[in-house]
Amino acid sequence: MEKSKGRKSVSQATVENCMENPGLELMEGGNLEQRYTQEEVTQGHSLEDGLGHSSLWSRRIFQPFTKARSFFERHAGLFRKILLGLLCLAYAAYFLAACILNFQRALALFVITCLVIFILACHFLKKFFPKEQLRCLKPLENTHLNLWAKRVFVGLSVVGLILWLALDTAQRPEQLISFAGICMFILILFACSKHHSAVCWRTVFWGLGLQFIFGILVIRTEPGFNAFQWLGDQIQIFLAYTVEGSSFVFGDTLVQNVFAFQSLPIIIFFGCVMSILYYLGLVQWVIQKVAWFLQITMGTTAAETLAVAGNIFVGMTEAPLLIRPYLADMTISEIHAVMTGGFATIAGTVLGAFISFGIDASSLISASVMAAPCALALSKLVYPEVEESKFKSKEGLKLPRGEERNILEAASNGATDAISLVANVAANLIAFLAVLAFINATLSWLGEMVDIHGLSFQVICSYVLRPMVFMMGVQWADCPLVAEIVGVKFFINEFVAYQQLSQYKNKRLSGVEEWINGEKQWISVKAEIITTFSLCGFANLSSIGITLGGLTSMIPQRKSDLCKIVVRALFTGACVSFISACMAGILYVPRGAETDCVSFLNTNFTNRTYETYVCCRELFQSTSLNGTNMPSFSGPWQDNVSSLRNLASCCDLYTSTVCA
């Protein structure tokens, strides 16, 4: 150490005196480097010996853990099955306990469990019996049914339909008007067909038949009606959770009183949920099954059927994305079917907004599902296939999966994507309502010039569309109001139309008088259902630009074909909704037990309701004035001691000639 210090001091002195000696410095540097290298080697040997001993001890300590990990890796499949079996047993115990304690309370759990079991069963059948399943999935045109058997089937179907109509309409002959309406729309569309001789009537009749059968299951049968009523109630309960998020952001006052903060957030919530379901593959699975069923029955091609089936769940611009790789190679007839499906149905995201208006959820769901086969049928009636399609078999058609990497990203993207839809809806409502107000003001001004008072766009629609609405099955007294709504939907927007329908429904439920100063204030329940079906679609003039913009961005090379058929597809989609309304008019029957008005009026006079109005009207009709004497009553009110008191209470709420 002293020598080194000495050298260091000499060297430093040399540098300080500017008398450097390169040879001395080089020799000293070499000696230092050699010494330091020998020390590093010695220290390295000792470090390696230490690390060797520690590594040996660590291997001995962690050897049991390493063996355990390798054991679990070798038997990972077995442990996964054991864990899955334990979870299934635990869920089975929970499921049985819930059903035994209160089956009505566990009904939703029961339905979800049955759906999951059905999906798993289909998955295992496809996995273990692929050949047998593919044999069953062949379209019906490939089966060996001879012409005689087909004719017998068609004949039996026609005879069955005639017998059903004869027996069913014997009690309600007004339903024949709706049947005549279906025939009228089909004849009009056939007259407008592009190729009359190329119409495949099998596709047309199968589509209408499937729509009719589904309507019977949903509207007429008690289990089907209760199932869809229950489904609609569950969707309403589910959508009500939107209030929690919107109230936190906007506050309770805005959410309860302002439309934009009450209904539009539902679109964001529903878009988030749909994105999650799409990420999980449930939406694609349902679309493929619906498309397969429509294809084997109606004989349509795979690409157009997938798009139309997808329109049940997604909108007119999202459904073509499902078949985007195949759009360029599709025939004009197939593209026409895709367009018609978009115009004839509504998106799942806006379904929640319509339900928030107070529109019957089960009717909206039924109309959306019933529109799919009818859209394919009428599309092939208006624009039959005359080209050779490349998609006669569904092999090779794959629905795209979401690009999200996890479920949280899917939820976030779904909510974010819905913002543009919310902005679009809000902007359209502002613009179209303002335009409608301007049109009404202009028409009113023009009418005043020739002493025509109260002229408006709605009044014109009520006269022009009244015969068509009557052919759907609407009572003549309700036709003016329904015709107004249908005209607003086609020329303005379906949101405005559904909002107007909800106003009429709210008036009826709140017990407003049906006629005030000669003007009808609301429509009947049957008219509400028929109107709900007739409005269930995007077939309005503003949708032409949306459809052309979406499809042109995907297949710009076929812009001329798109522009050539878009108007034809628009009117076809509108007729799909009208025929669905006719189906509802044929199948509608009043439901629910009739109100015992005598007991009802004896116990319920707290506020105005629809039942209060009906019972008071019945009491007014049963009352006879006898000059200055006490009024007399007939029917169930004749021997009722409280009839006079109930009459006085009804006169406090409503006006009638017997109240004078």
From Swiss-Prot:
Location of this chain's protein in the cell:
Membrane; Apicolateral cell membrane
Q: What InterPro entries does the annotation carry?
A: C_nuclsd_transpt (IPR008276), C_nuclsd_transpt_met_bac (IPR018270), CNT_C_dom (IPR011657), CNT_N_dom (IPR002668), Gate_dom (IPR011642)
Coarse class of the protein's main subcellular location: membrane
> Quick one: a GO cellular component term?
plasma membrane
- Highest taxon listed in the record's lineage: Eukaryota
Tell me, what is an example of a GO biological process annotation in this record? purine nucleoside transmembrane transport
Is Mitochondrion a UniProt keyword of this protein?
Answer: no
Q: Name one GO molecular function term.
A: purine nucleoside transmembrane transporter activity
Residues modified as Phosphoserine: 46
Catalytic reaction list: adenosine(out) + Na(+)(out) = adenosine(in) + Na(+)(in); inosine(out) + Na(+)(out) = inosine(in) + Na(+)(in); guanosine(out) + Na(+)(out) = guanosine(in) + Na(+)(in); uridine(out) + Na(+)(out) = uridine(in) + Na(+)(in)
Q: TM segments?
A: 82-102, 106-125, 150-168, 174-194, 202-222, 235-255, 262-282, 297-316, 338-357, 364-383, 425-445, 456-476, 531-551, 569-589
**How does the record classify its membrane topology?**
Multi-pass membrane protein
Q: What keywords would UniProt list here? A: Cell membrane, Membrane, Phosphoprotein, Transmembrane, Transmembrane helix, Transport
**What protein family is recorded?**
Belongs to the concentrative nucleoside transporter (CNT) (TC 2.A.41) family.
Q: What does this protein do?
A: Sodium-dependent and purine-selective transporter. Exhibits the transport characteristics of the nucleoside transport system cif or N1 subtype (N1/cif) (selective for purine nucleosides and uridine). Plays a critical role in specific uptake and salvage of purine nucleosides in kidney and other tissues. May contribute to regulate the transport of organic compounds in testes across the blood-testis-barrier.
Q: What is this protein called?
A: Sodium/nucleoside cotransporter 2
Say which species the protein is native to.
Mus musculus
Q: What is the lineage of its organism?
A: Eukaryota, Metazoa, Chordata, Craniata, Vertebrata
Q: Which gene encodes it?
A: Slc28a2
